[in-house]
């Protein structure tokens, strides 16, 4: 069937421009030809799983290590950059990573991105000063930008579509686990060794990933081109000009959210710096969208994606669910350590209900989706149980009994059982335009991680806005004492209170408890938004789509054979 004649239910996203037809000749391999089995498959999946875990853990782990890092470098002036550098580069380069995967061999691109991540980790580990550490974090973030989208692309190549729900579910469970355990692992390494091992740890684990991919992954054949791309054509295909609008927009928005706030932050919300960053982000985004419209099918972010309901729903659902879960993953360990007085080891044990349920729900839901072919009911389930679990945690108090917080965690852990659904939805929507899948997956991943960064920044602002007035009005602290609490960090709350006035410990813990409980409303709201977005996913069987893919692949092979005989 000629590429220019193809259409589908999803509308404009499924159309292939005739201009591309003479330059590219589809490869004749069937969709299943790159599938792996046995030891090679398991080895590749283990390597990819390690890469996902390390990349997600690096995003979540820094908070508990910051006090030790600032002590080593003898400065607190760059604390904001410690946390901002990684998500800034990861989010801003995410869409470009998708374009690179679409233009170059998957294996090579993944190895380069993951190599960048490991290089950044090494720079952080050996950093001798604050600027070197920040450069390392930015480098690692740039590498991480291509890790998750590359993982999803590789899984789609080595695992049939109807089996991907189970595999992607288990993979994404590692992301959720890393978000929860990242601060705990960081605390353990910092307490028992040095904060540098938070980054050195990535090197031997990352070596396993590199070996697995180099030895066992056979990348799918790429379409052959009748004429090679020139440098100007490649620049146009990668839409590097679009990057000049997109990257500043993301950087300025995240910096505004990182720096903006009252009291504990570098700039007030109404300061010229923060207002300027928000305005600059808005202008850059508008210019970027105008350019993307002009670029058409070569755009880094094809605007026709936003005419497809499945892709829109996938982006928004990933934004809401992972963003809401990251808030829980960040503040739940804080609640255990501040309110319950747990050390990092005990906190890790107390988080096990969340982690274990996370894995079990992924496996169970993955098997059910694999059998039935439909993931839609579980979209509602995931959003609903996260909303219920987080909503119940808004009632936290210092004496909340063990059975209660275990039950809340079980609900929240079960929520991530369907976090892989947005990526499955994209693959179904673009089943007849596989060359666009890496770009669309990068868009979904961007929304997931950008949502996580946005939600975490907002949650920290909510926490500070509830904490500071509470310490003054309820605990009777002076502004100078409040600043001491903010500077000391959450791990030193009990020790600092013992120095200031031990008799106020109970009231101080209540203030911290109320601030953390208040933050859980953000997670609840995000989950409820995700529940509403679930209505936007069309009901389409993954099994039926897999059979359709096989049939089309067989027809393509037959056409190629006939053409070869006639030639």
From Swiss-Prot:
Induction: Expression is positively regulated by the oxaleimides biosynthesis cluster-specific transcription factor poxB. It comes from the Eukaryota. MFS-type transporter; part of the gene cluster that mediates the biosynthesis of oxaleimides, cytotoxic compounds containing an unusual disubstituted succinimide moiety. The keyword Transmembrane applies. The chain crosses the membrane at residues 35-55, 77-97, 108-128, 141-161, 165-185, 197-217, 240-260, 271-291, 311-331, 349-369, 372-392, 410-430, 436-456, 515-535. This is MFS-type transporter poxA. Glycans are attached at residue 370. GO terms for molecular function: transmembrane transporter activity. Residues 1-24, 547-567 are annotated as: Disordered.
């Amino acid at each position: 069937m000629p590429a220019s004649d193809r259409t589908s239910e999803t509308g404009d996203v499924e159309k292939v421009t005739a201009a591309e037809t003479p330059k590219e000749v589809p490869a004749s391999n069937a969709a299943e030809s790159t599938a792996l089995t046995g030891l090679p498959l398991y080895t590749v999946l283990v390597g990819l799983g390690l890469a996902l875990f390390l990349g997600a853990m690096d995003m979540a782990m820094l908070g508990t290590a910051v006090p030790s890092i600032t002590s080593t470098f003898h400065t607190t002036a760059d604390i904001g950059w410690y946390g901002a550098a990684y998500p800034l580069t990861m989010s801003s380069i995410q869409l470009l990573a998708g374009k690179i995967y679409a233009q170059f061999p998957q294996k090579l691109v993944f190895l380069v991105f993951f190599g960048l991540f490991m290089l950044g980790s090494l720079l952080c580990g050996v950093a001798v000063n604050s600027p070197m550490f920040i450069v390392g974090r930015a480098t690692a973030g740039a590498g991480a930008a291509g890790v998750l989208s590359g993982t999803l692309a590789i899984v789609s190549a080595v695992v049939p579509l109807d089996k991907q729900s189970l595999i992607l579910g288990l993979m994404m469970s590692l992301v959720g686990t890393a978000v929860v355990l990242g601060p705990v692992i960081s605390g353990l390494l910092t307490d028992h060794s040095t904060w540098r091992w938070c980054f050195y740890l990535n090197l031997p684990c990352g070596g396993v990933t590199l070996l697995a991919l180099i030895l066992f992954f056979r990348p799918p054949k790429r379409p052959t081109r009748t004429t090679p791309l020139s440098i100007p054509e490649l620049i146009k295909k990668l839409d590097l000009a679009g990057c000049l609008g997109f990257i500043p927009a993301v950087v300025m928005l995240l910096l505004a959210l990182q720096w903006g706030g009252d009291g504990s932050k570098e700039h007030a919300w109404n300061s010229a710096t923060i207002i300027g960053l928000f305005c600059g982000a808005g202008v850059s985004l508008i210019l970027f969208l105008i350019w993307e419209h002009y670029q058409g099918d070569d755009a880094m972010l094809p605007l026709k994606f936003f005419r497809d309901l499945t892709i829109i729903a996938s982006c928004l659902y990933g934004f809401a669910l992972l963003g809401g879960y990251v808030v829980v993953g960040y503040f739940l360990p804080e609640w255990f350590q501040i309110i319950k007085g747990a050390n990092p080891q005990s906190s890790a044990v107390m988080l096990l209900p969340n982690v274990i349920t996370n894995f079990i729900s992924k496996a169970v839901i993955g098997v059910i989706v694999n059998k039935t072919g439909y993931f839609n009911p579980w979209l509602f389930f995931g959003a609903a149980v996260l909303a219920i679990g987080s909503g119940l945690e808004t009632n936290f108090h210092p004496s909340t009994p063990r059975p209660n917080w275990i039950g809340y965690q079980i609900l929240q852990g079960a929520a991530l059982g369907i976090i892989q659904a947005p990526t499955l939805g994209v693959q179904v929507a673009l089943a007849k335009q596989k060359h666009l899948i890496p770009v669309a997956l990068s868009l979904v991943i961007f929304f997931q991680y950008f949502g996580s960064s946005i939600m975490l920044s907002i949650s920290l602002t909510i926490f500070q806005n509830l904490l500071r007035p509470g310490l003054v009005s309820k605990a009777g602290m002076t502004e100078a004492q409040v600043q001491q609490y903010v500077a000391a960090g959450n791990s030193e709350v009990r020790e600092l209170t013992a120095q200031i006035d031990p008799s106020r410990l109970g009231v101080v813990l209540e203030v911290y408890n109320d601030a953390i409980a208040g933050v859980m409303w953000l997670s609840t709201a995000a989950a409820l938004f995700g529940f509403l977005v679930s209505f936007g996913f069309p009901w389409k069987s993954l099994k039926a789509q897999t059979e359709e893919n096989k049939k089309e692949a067989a027809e393509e092979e037959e056409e190629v054979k006939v053409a070869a005989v006639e030639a």
